[in-house]
């Protein structure tokens, strides 16, 4: 459950380390984002010589949340941290690598490129 002002880790090699959610996309009254949703983020911490720099405003896909997600078979999946992957306007990842596991719920939201780059799909 990601809302405005939530800090997230960045799970790719785009150069950003921490981002903050500044908007949840998908309707004017939408308050929360979950896994696979697109949010607008501000880069709060970045490494030198990265593809992005501190202060940039970008779009991102939420790939991990600390709030548990119920699956249709009754199982529950949750992660230790909130994490996102930065994307461009064509919904393609900016980075070339994804760090950490991602859930298979991303497949239903048509984020196939993130699924293919991820080292593990849960």
Swiss-Prot record:
Keywords: Ribonucleoprotein, Ribosomal protein, RNA-binding, rRNA-binding. GO terms for biological process: translation. Gene3D superfamilies: Ribosomal protein L14 (2.40.150.20). InterPro entries: Ribosomal_uL14 (IPR000218), Ribosomal_uL14_bac-type (IPR005745), Ribosomal_uL14_CS (IPR019972), Ribosomal_uL14_sf (IPR036853). One of its GO terms (cellular component) is cytosolic large ribosomal subunit. PROSITE patterns: RIBOSOMAL_L14. GO terms for molecular function: large ribosomal subunit rRNA binding; structural constituent of ribosome. Binds to 23S rRNA. Forms part of two intersubunit bridges in the 70S ribosome. Part of the 50S ribosomal subunit. Forms a cluster with proteins L3 and L19. In the 70S ribosome, L14 and L19 interact and together make contacts with the 16S rRNA in bridges B5 and B8. Belongs to the universal ribosomal protein uL14 family. PANTHER family: 50S/60S RIBOSOMAL PROTEIN L14/L23, LARGE RIBOSOMAL SUBUNIT PROTEIN UL14M. This is Large ribosomal subunit protein uL14. It comes from Sinorhizobium fredii (strain NBRC 101917 / NGR234). The lineage of its organism: Bacteria, Pseudomonadati, Pseudomonadota, Alphaproteobacteria, Hyphomicrobiales. The gene is rplN.
């Amino acid at each position: 459950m990601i809302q405005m002002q939530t800090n997230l880790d960045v799970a790719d090699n785009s150069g950003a380390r921490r981002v903050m959610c500044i908007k949840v996309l998908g309707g004017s009254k939408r308050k929360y984002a979950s896994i696979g949703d697109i949010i607008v983020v501000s880069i709060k911490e970045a490494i030198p010589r990265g593809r992005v720099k501190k202060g940039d405003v970008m779009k991102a896909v939420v790939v991990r949340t600390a709030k548990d997600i119920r699956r249709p078979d009754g199982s529950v999946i949750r992660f230790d941290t909130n994490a996102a992957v930065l994307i461009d306007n064509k919904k393609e990842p900016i980075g070339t690598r994804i760090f950490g596991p991602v859930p298979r719920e991303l497949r239903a939201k048509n984020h196939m490129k993130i699924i293919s780059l991820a080292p593990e799909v849960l």
